[in-house]
Amino acid sequence: MARTVQCIKLGKEAEGLDFPPYPGELGKRIFENVSKEAWAGWLKHQTMLVNENRLNLADARARQYLARQMEQHFFGGGADAAAGYVPPSA
């Protein structure tokens, strides 16, 4: 049976992650409080942040920025919007 968590992002009980997705204390908090669905949403947002801000993930400052954004996305007031992103018109 799948592990469930009370997802802090979605505000409902949902299937939990299979393993901590990030090292350290932040990864543990995400594992205990974030669902697979909410994590998938973060991965999409993270991709937009990397692309729109032209982040070089070999740069430690870019990785630190993404870690701060991840924490804000799940446990703070929300991550930065992707600057310059315009959603496709339907």
From Swiss-Prot:
Record-linked Pfam families: Iron_traffic
Positions in coiled-coil regions: none
Record keyword Iron present: yes
GO biological-process terms attached to the record: cellular response to oxidative stress
MF (Gene Ontology): iron ion binding
UniProt KW keywords: Iron
NCBIfam families: PRK05408.1
Protein family: Belongs to the Fe(2+)-trafficking protein family.
Entry function: Could be a mediator in iron transactions between iron acquisition and iron-requiring processes, such as synthesis and/or repair of Fe-S clusters in biosynthetic enzymes.
Protein name: Probable Fe(2+)-trafficking protein
Source organism: Paracidovorax citrulli (strain AAC00-1)
